[in-house]
């Protein structure tokens, strides 16, 4: 088979034209599209990488924030526990202090009640002792002589300072003296009383006489505003007061 040169040349020209046409209408657009797709893929990859980095940064921030929050929570919890422990200790201390105060007040009140009861019992015991002694004395010495008691009263009057004796003399001059004895005095006893009173306070002193069995024995001189006593009732009363006072002083000591 013979090959014509012009045919070959025409075929070559056709091939070149086809290549040019394919290059212009197919290859270049395909390459351009590939480049665009490649660029878009690169952009997407870069954007994804940026997003991954941003996500990592956000995650790191979240981890840091979580760690900070946990640290703050631990600090707040520790502070709350410390405050709660301190407040609890303060409450315990206050409760102990209040309890001690209540106990102290209770002990004080109990001690005061006990002292009052003891004082009341001592007073009753002293009063009972004095009453018993008075009854025994009244039964043992009926009608005891008044002269020794009157002599002691006169001795006390004599021992008074002059201003006080003048005051008593003025009261006697104005209102007289009432002489009270445990039993009624006979005329001799009254005469003895008049003699002693007139000697001490003046001859013009008015005297009246009375009797009071509760004196047990002794005498009382009643002036207008003053009473001078020397009797067993007065003595027993002073003994009772001394007994009670002695018990109080002994208890306080």
From Swiss-Prot:
Main subcellular localisation: membrane
Annotated Gene Ontology cellular component terms: plasma membrane; proton-transporting ATP synthase complex
Spans through the membrane: 5-27
Record keywords, A-Z: ATP synthesis, Cell inner membrane, Cell membrane, CF(0), Hydrogen ion transport, Ion transport, Membrane, Transmembrane, Transmembrane helix, Transport
Membrane-topology annotation of the record: Single-pass membrane protein
GO molecular function: proton-transporting ATP synthase activity, rotational mechanism; proton-transporting ATPase activity, rotational mechanism
Places the protein is found: Cell inner membrane
Pfam families in the record: ATP-synt_B
Signal peptide: none
Record-linked InterPro entries: ATP_synth_b/b'su_bac/chlpt, ATP_synthase_B_chain
Subunit relationships: F-type ATPases have 2 components, F(1) - the catalytic core - and F(0) - the membrane proton channel. F(1) has five subunits: alpha(3), beta(3), gamma(1), delta(1), epsilon(1). F(0) has three main subunits: a(1), b(2) and c(10-14). The alpha and beta chains form an alternating ring which encloses part of the gamma chain. F(1) is attached to F(0) by a central stalk formed by the gamma and epsilon chains, while a peripheral stalk is formed by the delta and b chains.
Family: Belongs to the ATPase B chain family.
Stated role: F(1)F(0) ATP synthase produces ATP from ADP in the presence of a proton or sodium gradient. F-type ATPases consist of two structural domains, F(1) containing the extramembraneous catalytic core and F(0) containing the membrane proton channel, linked together by a central stalk and a peripheral stalk. During catalysis, ATP synthesis in the catalytic domain of F(1) is coupled via a rotary mechanism of the central stalk subunits to proton translocation.
Protein name: ATP synthase subunit b 1
Organism per entry: Rhodospirillum centenum (strain ATCC 51521 / SW)
């Amino acid at each position: 088979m013979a090959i014509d040169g012009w045919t070959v040349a025409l075929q070559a020209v056709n091939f070149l034209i086809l290549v040019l046409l394919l290059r212009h209408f197919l290859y270049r657009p395909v390459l351009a599209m590939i480049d665009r797709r490649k660029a878009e893929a690169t952009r997407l990859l870069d954007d994804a990488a940026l997003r991954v980095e941003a996500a990592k940064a956000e995650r790191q921030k979240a981890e840091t924030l979580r760690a900070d929050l946990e640290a703050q929570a631990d600090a707040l919890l520790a502070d709350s526990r410390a405050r709660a422990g301190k407040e609890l200790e303060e409450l315990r201390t206050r409760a102990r202090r209040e309890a001690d105060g209540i106990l102290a007040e209770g002990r004080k009140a109990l001690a005061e009640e006990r002292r009052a009861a003891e004082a009341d019992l001592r007073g009753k015991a002293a009063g009972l002792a004095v009453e018993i002694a008075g009854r025994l004395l009244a039964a043992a010495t009926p009608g005891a002589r008044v002269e020794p008691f009157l002599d002691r009263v006169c001795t006390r009057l004599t021992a008074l300072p002059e201003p006080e004796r003048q005051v008593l003399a003025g009261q006697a001059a104005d209102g007289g003296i009432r002489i009270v004895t445990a039993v009624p005095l006979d005329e001799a006893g009254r005469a003895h009383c008049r003699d002693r009173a007139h000697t001490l306070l003046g001859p013009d002193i008015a005297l009246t006489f009375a009797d009071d069995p509760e004196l047990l024995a002794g005498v009382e001189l009643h002036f207008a505003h003053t009473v001078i006593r020397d009797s067993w009732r007065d003595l027993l009363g002073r003994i009772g007061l001394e007994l009670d006072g002695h018990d109080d002083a002994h208890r306080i000591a």
